[in-house]
C-alpha cells in the first residue's frame, strides 16, 4: 500500500466524517 492510496483513503474518511457531522448538525442532534 503506497502513500498515495493511503492519503486518498484518509481524505475520503475525513470527508465522509465531516459530511455526516454537518448532516447531524442540521438535523438538530
Swiss-Prot record:
SUPFAM superfamilies: PetN subunit of the cytochrome b6f complex (SSF103451). Component of the cytochrome b6-f complex, which mediates electron transfer between photosystem II (PSII) and photosystem I (PSI), cyclic electron flow around PSI, and state transitions. GO terms for cellular component: chloroplast thylakoid membrane; cytochrome b6f complex. InterPro entries: Cytochr_b6-f_cplx_su8_sf, Cytochrome_b6-f_cplx_su8. The chain crosses the membrane at residues 3-23. It comes from Nicotiana tomentosiformis (Tobacco). It is found in: Plastid, Chloroplast thylakoid membrane. The 4 large subunits of the cytochrome b6-f complex are cytochrome b6, subunit IV (17 kDa polypeptide, PetD), cytochrome f and the Rieske protein, while the 4 small subunits are PetG, PetL, PetM and PetN. The complex functions as a dimer. Belongs to the PetN family. The keyword Iron-sulfur does not apply. HAMAP family: Cytb6_f_PetN. It is a single-pass membrane protein. GO terms for molecular function: electron transporter, transferring electrons within cytochrome b6/f complex of photosystem II activity. Disulfide bonds: none annotated. This is Cytochrome b6-f complex subunit 8. One of its GO terms (biological process) is photosynthesis. It comes from the Eukaryota. Keywords: Chloroplast, Electron transport, Membrane, Photosynthesis, Plastid, Thylakoid, Transmembrane, Transmembrane helix, Transport.
Amino acid at each position: 500500500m503506497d502513500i498515495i492510496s493511503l492519503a486518498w483513503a484518509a481524505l475520503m474518511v475525513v470527508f465522509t466524517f465531516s459530511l455526516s457531522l454537518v448532516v447531524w448538525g442540521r438535523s438538530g442532534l
